Amino acid sequence: MAQLKYNKDIDELERNAAKWWPDFLAKKESSTSIIPKLVESQDAFISLLNLSKNNPFDIFQLIDASKFPPNLFLKHLVVLTDFGGEPLNRLNQNFDSLFPMIPYGIHYITKVLGKFEFFWNEKKYEYVFQELPVTSLTNSKLKIDGASISKTVPLSDLYKDVIVLLMFGANAVNSEVSEVLMKCEVGNLIGKTDELKKFIKERYIFVSRITGGAEANTLGQVAQTHVIDFLRTRFGSKGHDIKSNGHIEGVTHNDGQTLTTFDVVIKKGSKSVAIEISFQVTTNSTIERKAGQAKARYDMVSDTGNYIAYIIDGAGNFQRKNAITTICNNSHCTVAYTEEELNVLLKFILEKLE
């Protein structure tokens, strides 16, 4: 019987590759993908903005009455303004320096709240924040990431605070605020149906990198999670320690100051196998980054008496032949993302760790 070959070259790897996402992974990904939800709800989102033409704050009643998920409404605004994640959290951290804090009292109970003044339809409006600033303002907290965008949430004061900023921020009376939020001008198109549709179409194209990045991240997470589940099913009761984003003792970077992180690490006793995963249907720079790190990682892992394996697949990756070749030359085991190939990886791990 021929000995199983673990360290394939690029041609052998491509012959065994799936190239396109397997159905079971695509189904997992679609349950967490943001893009379809934005496309499906775009017309309803536009309708809400068109109806809110008498008062800028009517939008809150309309969201409530229509049962439109406030986190999905906010996600539309984040994509259209290109102002979410880190920029939004940075605004939250600098909140006190941008918005005047005013004491408000009801029945002698005083609370200090931030105030936002802005122009809309040639009138000046004032909005008093009820929740901002908060300890941390992240996509997960706002339920606008892939994992939680489908969750049912109420229209809280925090949502109202952020929606007002993203809709009218560019119209702030305070020039410093309007400069920070210069892209937050969706509110200026309320009631202007044709202009609003044109703006939204153009902005979705312009910021497609946000949704594209979200999709790539989600797909990558699904692929990594499936590998971990696959390994745990087969090794869970055999004393193997399996970790996502794991480390190997002695494998470092930054002049030895930081342990190197691998997508998956499986360990038994003193031996470990690090696993790096890349499945790209469309070409991007992820595989180039992994290739750039491949030799140094291979050398360090080998020097510590351990092993490194790669799971590489996707039509986009195989367009980067030099990168794939570099990885194949600096790997103890290289497999594609099919059940048959994952079983080859399984045999490699058994051979090296048992």
Swiss-Prot record:
Gene name, Swiss-Prot/TrEMBL: banIR
EC supergroup of this enzyme: hydrolase
Keyword tags: Endonuclease, Hydrolase, Nuclease, Restriction system
Designated name of the protein: Type II restriction enzyme BanI
Any Gene Ontology biological process: DNA restriction-modification system
One Pfam family hit: RE_BanI
Subunit organization: Homodimer.
Catalytic activity: Endonucleolytic cleavage of DNA to give specific double-stranded fragments with terminal 5'-phosphates
Native source organism of the sequence: Aneurinibacillus aneurinilyticus
Keyword Magnesium: no
Entry's EC annotation: 3.1.21.4
GO molecular function annotations of the record: type II site-specific deoxyribonuclease activity
